[in-house]
């Protein structure tokens, strides 16, 4: 299943990595470990942040996806299940059944 993993980089921690000259290396290492399908960097709620689109086949993969962000960046995270257009099309019969039953 695909998830959108958004994270904030606390200013103090990110600034320290930048001053040490290890910020880019740290981010590269995290991305190599997590292997996101897509990556975007932005601001989130006024802080440096990023969005990784990740794929997990099993819930046991979750620690490997989030712990690098917790340990390296002290990053608060949010996970949100996302679908591709193909996923939505595949799920449309269940959507229609629910609408008929509960709508």
Where are the regions a protein language model picked out?
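Conserved, structured core segments of small domains
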Residues: 1-103
């Amino acid at each position: 299943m695909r998830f959108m993993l958004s994270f904030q980089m606390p200013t103090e921690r990110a600034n320290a990595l930048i001053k040490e000259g290890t910020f880019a290396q740290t981010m590269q290492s995290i991305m190599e470990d997590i292997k996101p399908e897509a990556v975007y960097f932005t601001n989130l709620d006024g802080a440096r942040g990023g969005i990784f689109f990740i794929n997990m086949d099993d819930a046991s993969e979750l620690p490997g996806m989030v712990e690098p962000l917790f340990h390296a960046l002290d990053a608060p995270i949010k996970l949100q299940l996302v679908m591709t257009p193909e996923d939505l099309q595949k799920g449309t019969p269940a959507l229609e059944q629910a609408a008929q039953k509960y709508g």
